[in-house]
Amino acid sequence: MRVPSAKLLSALGSGWQVPAALRRLYADVVWLQQLATDELRPGPGRIRTSVRMAFISAVGAALMAALHVDSALGPVTLWVALYASTSRLTASEGLIMIVVYAATLIASVFLAGVLTDVPWMLLPFFGVATALGLYALNKLQLGGAWFNVVVGFLDTFYLCAFDPKNFGWSVAYSFSGIALAIGVLVAFDMVLWPDPAERRLLRSLADTLDRQGQRLAAIGRAYLDPLAVAVLPQPAGVSVLSSQLPLLERARRELGDPQREAILLAAVTTTERIHIEIERLLAVARDDVPRDIRLRLRPEMNGVLQTLGAALQHQAHRAATGLGPSDDSTDEELNTAIRSSLDTLQEREQLALSERPPAGAPAIANIAAFNLGLRRIGLRLLNKPLGDVHGLAFPQDMRSGATPSGGADPALMRHSAKLGLAATLAYVVGVASHRSELAVIVWTAVIAGLPTYGATLRKMILRMVGAVIGGLLGLLMIFVVSPNFESLGSYLLAFFIALFVAAYVGLSSGRLAYAGQQGGVSFVLAYASLSPNVNVHEPLWRVWGIFLGLVIVTLVFLLITPEYAGKAIVPRLTRILHAALELLRPASGMTEQRVQEINMDVTLDLTQVLGIAEDARMEGRHSGIVPDSVVEVAGTLRRIVHHLSGIATGRLAMPQTALPAEIQTARAGCDTAVRYHLQSWLEVLEDEHGPDRRRILEVAAHFTPDDLAVPLAELNEYLSGSGLGALASWPAAARSLLLAELESYSRLVVLVTELDHQFVEIPAAGAR
């Protein structure tokens, strides 16, 4: 009889105590198994994308070998561009990139020749040039192959140190390799094999929603199983948000359409919030309490689960078909069915609970929590079409991705300075070793230091693992392929196989992605050559250089002012709250254009907040924040800003309309109440000591339900009485705007109250 390993340990005789080391080993094995299952599961388009990345890289490497371009920087540039690109590469952008590469390499040849004679200036210049170059690229939001502009510039100084008389030829080969890499990428992105990010994102959303529907159904079956035989799903180890955010950013750059960007962002946020609510339902369902009360509600709960499943299926279909205009009749039917089933369940629940004796308190609390989760999913997340942005208008001439032009970014300056120091230390180590093959130590310091927040140690460990695996794979190809096959086809096939594996792993979440990406870089550096090469010494030195570069970057980032996600998220939430308050107290020069600009700025900030939440998942308790609560706050703030911008736009449309004194007083009271709550949270974030749990709890304790409900009740009372008759003489458009404003206030009361509760949950347990 086969006994599962988990039961085997518990079934051991009581006379033998399992050693703690064995228990830890078993736990680690189970964790690795779960990690591999979660991360390496085929997703929508994952195999296709991996094949595309590997094929393009292999074709580029084979082309460079056929043309006798003796530089590993070309294949590396192509691989880095494929996994780190923020958008597809157009012909005009590719031409600009080649011109910039040419200009920087020419300048580097001249400067290297001059500074070689003045070594005391070389190291300071090296560090400052690295920091300034990376700061400029990040400030301009230029990623992917653009980072190798700095790599190529710095590589010239390394080449000059070992061959000051003839290093110009090596620089020329580097430029040829980079130019070919860019040309290959442009050809595939634009003509041979285009891969729009929006299509990939929509496939991912559709697949995620479909999986969530299946997961919700499985939880419901197990929760309502009278015999408790059905097994609950395992808690999700990670969300798909980390894979969707890069696609969202690429789609934003490719589309250049603010309205479409907002729709995609709303869809991603809603999908993640559904994921969070379903995981909360799972946590409730795992409680071991009596089942009799839930079985009395089984027909009604099954009805709710079926309607929610149908709504999720409809949302998945909308994502799969492009998030086009919604079918109002279908949406209305689903909303009616959801509300009807939830109302029926609520009535039946109240009747059942009234008949339940006090001894069943745990079961009562459990069923109440489960049904509340169902209501949240049905009435807050599935009550609108996926991607709904509340009917906002967007500017037609504003670039989505525009960033504020004024002022320096202190966090980015610190990050760039650290990379400058790391690159300088790597240069010193490489030159002191007297090995020209260690040029990759400088490349690694720049490539591995792409801007991220938090989880430095874990990310660098993953990169080191990837470097070792990629290097070993390159050596394996040298031992197996090179002595037996000499054709260009075998060279291309070896590249394709190795880079397919690296690309597939690199498309995982942050828990494995860095290993796959770095593994691809290591393989390219170890195996790239002009002809089959059986000499392993040069590849070994390159792999060693990668390892040294990663160690240097890790030490610099861990020892010099390390930053965690909890710190990085504060300025973004602060900017969003400032934007909301600007809409609440508009200046005299406020225009509809400014309202739209505020909306787009908030959209960009929220995208960053979601990314930092994923970093916090990797950091765990060290981040000081709860990632799920951050995602909840992001979604709530997005809806608050959208409602406030709708109110501001409506008021700008009827500035000359004389309002009755009662309406003016009630509106002012609503504005004051919302402003009080938002301003209080802004002051918490701007505190010189930073937000801490005690301060957040103190602020939340001052809020009462009447803060928001009383002004709104006064406005409703007036309009329910004589106020509505007083509006009869108003123009229809003005009357509609005022009633729409009242509806927005009704939603703001709920949203601001939710925000108060969600802010309290942001600090992690034990955080200051």
Predicted regions and their residues:
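A transmembrane helix-and-boundary motif of multi-pass membrane transporters/channels
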Residues: 1-260, 367-371, 382-628, 632, ...
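Soluble C-terminal extramembrane regulatory/interaction domains of multi-pass membrane proteins
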Residues: 204-226, 267-393, 636-768
